């Protein structure tokens, strides 16, 4: 005979009721039951007992418990009441009947007759099953173990968990989730608690199930309002991690509420969990039904009775916590009391252990350390006040190390923490959470509970935004940031949330569209970093809100097309046309560039305001970060044109053009030009009132991981050197990204300083679309490949919060995709243009005829006078005063030297209304103490700039011109890039950058290669920047000799630059004026002299400034004046620069009338016509030489040796070279060797 309990246990009544309904009307029963009920036999067999619903007078699961006082909580903005009704809380099992559960049923007492007036009701169906089950339960011999467990850690860690879930994916963890999971884990150590008793073939048997199936008592309300109890099982619990357990738990409860449970859900429960604590019951002994070995009861969480009348403050002061009572009612036939007691002790220890909570926090992806159990610290409240203030300071300093900012969470085993941020390390414990401490104005309060303090600190510094600002030295800036960061963030309105979603839709749909339509084409997609689009949008919107004039964006190639489309507003048709290779040749002179380097301009209209603002994106090369100084210079030029001033006191219009710079993480940390550019931030000649830096931190540089590409904790650490606040933000939280962007703009406007936003994200594909990143970064891409995109996760969050419906989200995305598809089809139909070789841009800009660069003598005199027009009481340095007097003398009498000729050119342009900007290392005085453009008072240090007087006409009216002269930082890369950018922003200005020595210009080689020499051909970007490069062999060694003429000549093509090496002050004067006035926007490279600055032969007369213009080819004055006889010349020496003076001195010394020296003043473009005409004047020449002091492989010869014979084949086919031998360095390091070599060149020229 078998005596195995029914597989449905307490749910037998429900199965029987379902069977009756099925028998009467099969359609009234869910179809999932049909297959089971067709063969079901409702008759009980053996000793099986029907389970029945609980009395409707019993408590229901959803009913909220009595409110708790002094609810403990972990730091949170609002600590939810601990006993708010939790989802899926098991309802209490029927209360135990009196008695000890003996197996022998006592005799039934006689039933007294009903009194008159009593109402009689015969119990049938489910109610009758209750009677039968309760009577049958008396046959199970039970005993009960009871244990009181501290609930404080359970309460506090649950608050931590739910606060995090509230901010991320939503949902809530109940106490029963945690207790149920702890119960399952304890069963692994005590498998006997999972057994049950049965009689098989008349023999007592203990059955150990293969799995743990936890029964949950669920209270249900019928259509008639009556309540009933079912016990559904979570199957195979022992195999589940916590997240899986919660999912299974919620699934069972949801299906129970919806009437979707199946027969399988009721069968096989091995141990049950009941929760009479929901109605305040502290301790109960539930009945144990056949088929189970134990039922665990959970009592209410209460303070000990003797403290329930105490105040919240007194309870906190005493360190009193709530208790929760667990009972284990077990079948004493197979489970012993010690075993049950140890089982409860294990649950007790587990709920207080670090490992249990660490496991749950990891499973829920909570990046913070759980609160730890500890005993109370008896120190005085005064002593702890100081510790609390230390804790606040620690969060302000180190809170960013705990922030949840990595969307990939690659190190999932590590909690984000720091010893300074743990309350235990400050002598504080969880018992202090509800104590009140003095906080001296923190968050606008004088006193706060530690729980509230921690909640505010974690919300401010440790959620999806990490803030670094304590490195800033200015206390006002620190306080400003604290006030905004430590204040509760206002949640975006639903309209704002929908707008953010629309930007994410646009960003993702754009990338998906290109990936689908242009498979395999490089586009350096933004996938994985789409939140940068709503971030940039929010920043630009805030700039518009401040009434600013323009946002200028500089960025690398990643995401550039998306920014062009969704931020700048470049037409999709144009972008897709470029993908099709469908470029109109009429608009595509020059080499052009790849589609992800091009720039554009648009107008941004506020979505929730009435303002608009200009937005532009500058062109850039693939040289990462090279665009940084260019952008800064471009913005400074625009600001100088607007001339709103530079008010540091909050004037909204000061610095009204905003540079927004996007970076990659590896480049920001790795490229030195970033630090060079940051160093410009506060310098008077370079300040732009703050740049918004956005780092698209995809945590990889091509294939290189951060630990191999930087030595700092963050890629942003370099920005600390300028005191910029740094915000690290999780790219999976677009609302946080938008909030940070607006705060960054507000800070920039308030303090006119740079701000850095470090948006951590990931790169969905390889470095480009043809790359497989899993080859070198497999662990990262195992995570990336299964990660849900930010658009999906944000959409789910909005839907989950009820902000939008699923249909609204789908419609928005579908509309955008349809728009792209329509444009794509239109592009397919556009006129196709044939592809041919690229065309030169040289003819696009031609020198105008008849351009006059001479000036009136009176203007020269005005400029000379300006140098002695010192302010009253101004004392020039005694060594400078003679220089000033000499300049006035030169202005009237002539013999003008190089330095004054330059100042005459610049001053005359200022007088003519030009903005002139001159910068470089030591430029105000001049490397060789030659310029003295700014005079310093010997006594007071005050400054006087004579040429600025030329900005005013003699009648007192302004000319419109300005003279801006600055000493630059010790930088070439950033400094040259800045000046190039300035000319892009103000094409009409004359902008000059001077190298300290021409040798050092190679520090800016990237700018020269990528912008100066090729910007016009690649992007149609025009610049008329001037580089002044001191050059000449004078025995100062290889690093103070050469500006590398050969490199510039190699770069020159299709009129890209003018390269000159003038040899007279007046020709230099006319060269600068021609460059400023000719309307051609192309760079000018001038190789300027050093020793020649003080060469008494290298001077010019006044008439050379007032009567002639720039001459690209010069003969010796003796021939130009008609004194020399050209017919006697049999040898022509072609040369440039200061070497001319050495050659002419030797010629005069030796009386060599047979030798003529012709100077080529303009090296490129070569003046073919003028050179030909000049050489034609010497009819009897038999040999031509190119003479240079540079080595044979350097200087002009490598190009001239090829080009001159082609240019003038009749004369220069046999052109020979006289120079130093080919050398790897520019010169010898010995001045004596230099002298020998120099003399050899001169001797050879006249041999």
Swiss-Prot record:
Co-factor requirement: Mg(2+); thiamine diphosphate
Chain segments carrying region Linker: 42-104
InterPro entries on file: 2-oxoacid_DH_actylTfrase, 2-oxogl_dehyd_N, 2oxoglutarate_DH_E1, CAT-like_dom_sf, DH_E1, KGD_C_sf, ODO-1/KGD_C, THDP-binding
Pathway recorded for this protein: Carbohydrate metabolism; tricarboxylic acid cycle; succinate from 2-oxoglutarate (transferase route): step 1/2; Carbohydrate metabolism; tricarboxylic acid cycle; succinyl-CoA from 2-oxoglutarate (dehydrogenase route): step 1/1
Coiled-coil residue windows: 803-833
Catalytic residues identified in the record: 332
Region annotated 2-oxoglutarate dehydrogenase E1, C-terminal part, chain positions: 354-1247
Residues that, per the record, bind 2-oxoglutarate: 597, 622, 1040
Keywords: Acyltransferase, Allosteric enzyme, Coiled coil, Decarboxylase, Lyase, Magnesium, Metal-binding, Multifunctional enzyme, Oxidoreductase, Thiamine pyrophosphate, Transferase, Tricarboxylic acid cycle
Disordered: region residues: 23-118
Comp. bias regions, Basic and acidic residues: 23-37
Composition bias, Low complexity: 51-60, 66-88
SMART domains registered for this protein in UniProt: Transket_pyr
One Gene Ontology term, aspect cellular component: oxoglutarate dehydrogenase complex
Binding of acetyl-CoA, residues: 1058, 1074, 1109, 1112, 1162, 1169-1170
Residues that bind Mg(2+): 665, 698, 700
Cited Pfam families: 2-oxoacid_dh (PF00198), 2-oxogl_dehyd_N (PF16078), E1_dh (PF00676), OxoGdeHyase_C (PF16870), Transket_pyr (PF02779)
PANTHER family for the chain: 2-OXOADIPATE DEHYDROGENASE COMPLEX COMPONENT E1 (PTHR23152:SF4), 2-OXOGLUTARATE DEHYDROGENASE (PTHR23152)
Family: Belongs to the 2-oxoacid dehydrogenase family. Kgd subfamily.
Protein function: Shows three enzymatic activities that share a first common step, the attack of thiamine-PP on 2-oxoglutarate (alpha-ketoglutarate, KG), leading to the formation of an enamine-thiamine-PP intermediate upon decarboxylation. Thus, displays KGD activity, catalyzing the decarboxylation from five-carbon 2-oxoglutarate to four-carbon succinate semialdehyde (SSA).
Summary of subunit composition and partner proteins: Homodimer. The 2-oxoglutarate dehydrogenase (ODH) complex contains multiple copies of three enzymatic components: 2-oxoglutarate dehydrogenase (E1), dihydrolipoamide succinyltransferase (E2) and lipoamide dehydrogenase (E3).
Name under which the protein is recorded: Multifunctional 2-oxoglutarate metabolism enzyme
Native organism: Mycolicibacterium paratuberculosis (strain ATCC BAA-968 / K-10) (Mycobacterium paratuberculosis)
Lineage: Bacteria, Bacillati, Actinomycetota, Actinomycetes, Mycobacteriales
